[in-house]
Regions:
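Rossmann-like NAD(P)H-binding beta-loop-alpha module
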Residues: 100-129
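Glycine-rich FAD pyrophosphate-binding loop
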Residues: 1-13, 131-140
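Catalytic nucleophile-loop/oxyanion-hole region of alpha/beta-hydrolase
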Residues: 16-22
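Conserved protein kinase catalytic core
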Residues: 9-10, 72-74, 117, 141
Length: 194
């Protein structure tokens, strides 16, 4: 198995915060794989450090490519390239790699699913002054589980429902200064339900 990161486990290791899934549980599962004979080489990116052709030359005969979730999606609004913005996957990965990170100021998380909630709760643990979640959906239709929502509120994180991002305003250094939201009356078209 070739893993481009320094530790195996993919999203289990780098995408799920340790307050939800302790890393020693993942490590134990990986040890079982090793005991079964799986040889794991970390820090090797297929297509960059090795190629399918070079692996064939080494004697590999079959390939299973499981690249997982490699990135996130920005909302396509003006200013989203401002310094200080991040997609969820990168934020959670960086938080796992560098646990000494301290967030200064306020953090806004856009989204209403469990991954957005993970980002908000992680930001709170990294000492953000204030964490606010903005979700298109109303509270009863948020994709996040009710338990996740309640735990988020218990941690003092504000959830604002029915808002979508319109624009990120940058300061003179290209950093996020503020984010402008628009009120969302309905997520789905009442006629087509799309």
């Amino acid at each position: 198995m070739f893993e481009k990161n320094e530790k195996p486990g993919g999203m289990l290791t780098y995408g799920i915060p340790s307050y939800k899934l302790e890393k020693d549980v993942i490590d134990a599962e990986i040890e079982i794989l090793k005991e079964l004979g799986v040889n794991i080489k970390c820090g090797v990116e297929v297509g960059k450090d090795v190629t399918i052709a070079s692996l064939r030359e080494e004697g590999f005969k079959a390939f299973y490519i499981a690249i997982g979730c490699q990135g996130g999606k920005l909302p396509g609004i003006p200013g989203e390239d401002a310094k200080g913005t991040s997609v969820a996957v990168k934020f959670l990965h960086d938080a796992t790699v560098d646990k000494s990170t301290i967030l200064n100021g306020n953090v806004v998380v856009v989204g209403g699913g469990n991954v957005a909630i993970d980002c908000a709760r992680t930001a709170k643990r990294f000492k953000a002054n204030k964490v606010s979640v903005f979700s298109l959906e109303d509270r009863n239709h948020m994709p996040a589980t009710n338990q996740e929502i309640l735990e988020t509120l218990d941690e003092g994180i504000e959830i604002n429902n029915g808002y979508g991002p319109k624009e990120i305003i940058k300061d003179e250094n290209g950093c996020v200064k503020q984010i402008v939201f628009k009120k969302c009356l309905s997520v789905n078209d009442p006629v087509t339900h799309k």
